[in-house]
């Protein structure tokens, strides 16, 4: 059988395109080299808990079109992201808000907090030369030392004085007691997990798992008129211009025979000495309950470690610096010349996408491609 579209990758971008193409009467084949669908939003049920296998995914958006679209495929709960920062046993509220400033300095009013921050920002004069100076110019020395420095150095594997200032364009400072990390109109987690949501998107569509497109490119290309490719753009071209860099993350998952490990979905460890950047306790994404509303007796945690990416590792975050940007531009030129191939998604476009921007991007592409 000849398909209208071969979709490479069953993450959000690939699954949504496949769904929309099928809805327009097109025949679609989806292939994925992993043994499961859903890409990095894949959740796996263990001990009654939906475990985010590739790191915490909290859906948030201000885009009503995106929200109305994705909620057709899952009911979302009311989870809001309120991480806690642990600095050597001192707990602080994230984002930086009045709870943070009260704990740090004993200030009680927004005016007192503003005065304290302004006082500390004065340390930096002129244009910040590196990330350390940039952070201090935004939030002052105390918050930088306890809540920014160690965490950032673990994430990037480099001293803050060696990192460019542009990495931290802004550090949201809130002069309220609002603990909601995202300023988003719509927020939540799909009830029953993301995998179920992607299953609904792919309903009635042929999916072949454990299928590496690049290893079987010629025979798979022959099956379809057009390809939608959501894998790494440099891999598609055999890395012939060089390798695009990513930051990677490693997870250590542990099942514990206790009902509650840390009392919150996410705790960031902001000192340099603790080797992990944060611990996720997955059950709190769904309020510690199973689908029938019963308390879950066990818990599952994931310790998250930032690591330098090397070929073969899972690519997570594109390193959008000048060098990689220029290399991507060259690959993009090659991609634009490929006939019958659409490159999309985080890896296909070498772009840091949140889930909502991925959805917006693929819906825009569908309008152009399928209308």
Where are these regions (language model features)?
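N-terminal Rossmann-like FAD-binding beta1-loop-alpha1 element of flavoenzymes
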Residues: 3-30, 366
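Short, solvent-exposed loop/turn segments at secondary-structure junctions
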Residues: 12-13, 35-36, 99, 153, ...
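Glycine-rich FAD pyrophosphate-binding loop
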Residues: 19-47
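Mid-domain catalytic core of redox enzymes
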Residues: 24, 214-334
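Short glycine/proline- and charge-enriched loop/turn segments
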Residues: 45-53, 179-181
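N-terminal FAD cofactor-binding segment of flavoenzymes
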Residues: 56-90
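Active-site/ligand-binding neighborhood in enzyme catalytic cores
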Residues: 85-92, 98-226, 230, 235-237
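C-terminal catalytic lobe of FAD-dependent flavoproteins
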Residues: 314-371
């Amino acid at each position: 059988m000849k398909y209208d579209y071969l979709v490479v990758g069953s993450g959000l971008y690939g699954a949504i395109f496949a769904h929309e193409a099928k809805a327009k009467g097109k025949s679609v084949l989806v292939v994925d080299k992993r043994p499961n669908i859903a890409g990095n939003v894949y959740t796996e049920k263990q001990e009654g808990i939906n475990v985010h296998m590739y790191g915490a995914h909290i859906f948030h958006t201000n885009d009503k079109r995106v929200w109305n679209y994705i909620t057709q495929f899952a009911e979302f709960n009311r989870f809001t992201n309120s991480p806690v920062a642990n600095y050597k046993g001192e707990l602080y509220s994230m984002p930086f808000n009045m709870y943070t400033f009260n704990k740090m300095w004993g200030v009680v009013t927004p005016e007192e907090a503003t005065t304290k921050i302004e006082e500390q920002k004065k340390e930096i004069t002129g244009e910040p030369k590196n990330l350390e100076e940039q952070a201090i110019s935004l939030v002052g020395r105390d918050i930088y030392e306890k809540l920014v420095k160690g965490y950032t150095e673990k994430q990037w594997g480099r001293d803050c004085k060696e990192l460019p200032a542009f990495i931290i364009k802004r550090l949201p400072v809130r002069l309220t007691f609002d603990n909601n990390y995202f300023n988003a109109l719509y927020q939540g987690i799909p009830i029953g997990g993301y995998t179920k949501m992607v299953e609904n998107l792919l309903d009635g569509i042929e999916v072949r798992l454990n299928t590496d497109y690049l290893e079987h490119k010629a025979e798979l290309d022959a099956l379809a008129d057009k390809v939608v490719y959501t894998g790494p753009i440099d891999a598609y071209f055999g890395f012939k211009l060089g390798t695009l860099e990513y930051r990677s993350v490693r997870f250590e998952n542990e099942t514990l025979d206790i009902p509650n490990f840390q009392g919150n979905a996410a705790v960031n460890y902001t000192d340099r000495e603790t080797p992990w950047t944060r611990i996720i306790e997955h059950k709190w994404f769904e309020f510690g309950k199973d689908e029938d509303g019963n308390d879950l007796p066990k818990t599952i945690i994931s310790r998250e470690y930032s690591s330098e990416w090397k070929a073969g590792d899972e690519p997570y975050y594109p390193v959008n610096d000048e060098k990689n940007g220029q290399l991507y531009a060259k690959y993009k030129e090659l991609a634009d010349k490929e006939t019958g191939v659409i490159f999309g998604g985080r890896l296909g476009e070498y772009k840091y996408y949140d889930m909502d921007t991925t959805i917006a991007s693929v819906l825009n592409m569908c309008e152009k491609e399928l209308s």
